[in-house]
């Protein structure tokens, strides 16, 4: 079970704090970022924010000042004094912005994948239609296991990461029907 350091939700129209909603299953978008250090830094923050905003437009959740609202909520909730090694999740639907912070788990070397026949809805977006994946992940020790998302006998990604296969100095990945993560895009740009 995941332990959260922070869970907050805000009404999008006026940024009033409301009871926390994780928004899983809703029509919306999320991003998960590694926040580390003191003072805190977020790995690839500009890329995550840009991708989140582009995806929100595609999902027709295009509110004025949404970027500033996100930054305001983060500044209000993240401590400049805390030493972080956490995962920060921002989730947005048409009415709500939710943020949560959980400890970053370090994967063990002897890692395994449980193959699960599952098709993600609109996999090119990091959307909130993630309940089936979460139901599998919640039954596992995520430092040792993840799921492999398989559809039509093809392996596309894991429940938490992209897949990269390397052979003879060439990188192989699925061609389509998977979410291209920010870290994946970074590595792809370096090859």
Predicted regions: what is each one?
Residues 1-76, 93-191:
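Helix-start/capping segments and mature chain N-termini
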Residues 78-86, 142:
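Short secondary-structure junctions
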């Amino acid at each position: 079970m995941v332990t959260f350091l922070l869970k907050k939700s805000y009404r999008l129209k006026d940024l009033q704090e409301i009871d926390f909603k994780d928004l899983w299953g809703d029509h919306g978008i999320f991003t998960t970022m590694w926040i580390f250090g003191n003072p805190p830094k977020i790995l690839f923050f500009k890329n995550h924010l840009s991708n989140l905003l582009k995806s929100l437009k595609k999902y027709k959740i295009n509110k004025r000042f949404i970027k500033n609202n996100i930054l305001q909520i983060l500044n209000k909730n993240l401590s400049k004094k805390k030493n972080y090694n956490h995962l920060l999740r921002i989730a947005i639907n048409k009415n709500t912005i939710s943020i949560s912070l959980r400890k970053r788990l370090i994967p063990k070397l002897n890692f395994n994948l449980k193959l699960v026949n599952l098709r993600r809805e609109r996999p090119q977006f990091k959307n909130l239609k993630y309940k089936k994946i979460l139901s599998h992940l919640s039954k596992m020790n995520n430092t040792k296991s993840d799921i492999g998302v398989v559809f039509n006998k093809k392996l596309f990604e894991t429940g938490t990461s992209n897949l990269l296969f390397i052979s003879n100095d060439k990188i192989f990945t699925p061609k389509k029907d998977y979410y291209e993560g920010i870290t994946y895009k970074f590595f792809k740009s370096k090859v």
